[in-house]
């Protein structure tokens, strides 16, 4: 019998209990208001429509059967179309807007019961790693937000590789 040396975990639905609602108008209203600070004046409906159009274009441009979107790249393209020329500024704003998007859409973010107790017990005997079908710009801050940073020797997030698992 082989000795178990490491244990792999998924993130959402295994360790983290999360609920989001990306249909909320507040998301697009908040982003539209934030964009005015950077000289971009759009109504929330325009923000929503453009976000989903760029997402669709991004998916169609990839040849994979299950393409992974890149939320930061969507917002970066959005900002480029709005005339924000500086790549540094676009990158920074894209990350902030992605975080706003997720933060406003999130109804719940919490650990499932006893997650830390179990991880503490397992960490004493095994190497722990995390593999998740997720966006790193959401997953990494959410790992920190619930206090799971420091438990895993390795964290693999699908968005780093541009692939996602089939539904």
Predicted regions, residues:
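Substrate-recognition element of Asp-dependent hydrolases with the DxDx(T/V) motif
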Residues: 92-111, 115-143, 156-158
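N-terminal helical cap/lid subdomain that shapes the substrate entry/recognition surface
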Residues: 2-111
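A general structural signal for well-ordered secondary-structure junctions
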Residues: 41, 85, 125-128, 149
């Amino acid at each position: 019998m082989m000795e178990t040396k490491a244990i792999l975990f998924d993130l959402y639905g295994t360790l983290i209990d999360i609920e989001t609602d990306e249909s909320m108008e507040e998301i697009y209203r908040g982003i539209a208001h934030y964009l005015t600070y950077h000289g971009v004046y759009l109504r929330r409906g325009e923000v929503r429509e453009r976000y989903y159009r760029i997402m669709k274009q991004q998916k169609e441009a990839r040849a994979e059967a299950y393409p992974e979107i890149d939320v930061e790249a969507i917002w970066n393209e959005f900002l480029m179309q709005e005339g924000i020329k500086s790549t540094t500024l676009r990158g920074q704003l894209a990350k902030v807007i992605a975080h706003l998007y997720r933060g406003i859409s999130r109804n719940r973010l919490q650990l499932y019961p006893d997650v830390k107790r179990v991880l503490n017990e397992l960490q004493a005997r095994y190497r722990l790693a995390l593999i998740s079908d997720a966006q790193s710009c959401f997953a990494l801050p959410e790992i920190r937000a619930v206090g799971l940073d420091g438990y895993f020797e390795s964290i693999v997030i699908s968005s780093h590789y541009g692939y996602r698992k089939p539904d």
